[in-house]
A protein has these predicted regions:
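N-terminal carbohydrate-binding accessory modules
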Residues: 1-55, 143-146, 164-169
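Pocket-edge positions in alpha/beta enzyme catalytic cores
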Residues: 35-39, 68, 101-104
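A broadly structural signal marking compact, well-ordered functional cores
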Residues: 78-83, 87, 106, 115, ...
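Active-site region of glycoside hydrolase catalytic domains
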Residues: 114-169
Length: 169
């Protein structure tokens, strides 16, 4: 069983045998949950108390450190803070879009979502991140865990799910 501590707040979730639970052991329906695309400033169709995947496009977040979209990331943080008020919880799904990173761009893709994680680190409604299939999973998890050890990681990949601490979605 994997239990994690949030840096600035109490842990809300734990992962066990590819399932997500609240800290009191109540199952959370992560597998098959709805996924929506982040759109800061827009009202998203989520119900109070819902758990969902929130897709964040690489182009929206910024493709490299010279082009991180701080306006988008600030809007994303504001949207996540609104989710907190409605007890909506999400995990971030990094999306490469039609521009899957070539191996030379993989580091930039990971760095972009590491930067995204820094910008939303105080959002209690974020349970963690999905591990993108287009990058080295161990590297992605290691990079995000270095400063954000409280995140739980999610995947649909059977190979990654061999680690019972990764949650199936």
């Amino acid at each position: 069983m994997l239990e994690v501590d949030f840096m600035k707040f109490e842990a809300k979730f734990k992962a066990e045998k590819n399932k997500l639970y609240t800290m009191d052991g109540t199952p959370v329906a992560a597998e098959g949950c709805r996924t929506i695309t982040a759109c800061p400033g827009a009202a998203l169709d989520l119900n109070d108390g819902e758990f969902a995947g929130l897709c964040v496009n690489w182009n929206d977040a910024g493709r490299d450190e010279d082009s991180y979209n701080e306006e988008f990331l600030a809007g994303l943080r504001d949207q996540l803070k609104e989710f907190e008020e409605r007890h909506i919880f999400v995990f971030i799904i990094p999306v490469a879009g039609s521009n899957e990173p070539a191996s030379a761009e993989e580091d930039a893709f990971i760095a972009s979502f590491k930067h995204c994680a820094r910008r939303i680190k105080d959002c209690e409604c974020v349970a963690g991140f999905a591990v993108p299939e287009c990058v080295d999973a161990a590297c992605f998890i290691s990079e995000l865990s270095a400063k954000h050890g409280h995140y739980i990681f999610f995947s649909k990949s059977d190979a990654l799910l061999a680690d019972g601490g990764i949650v199936r979605y």
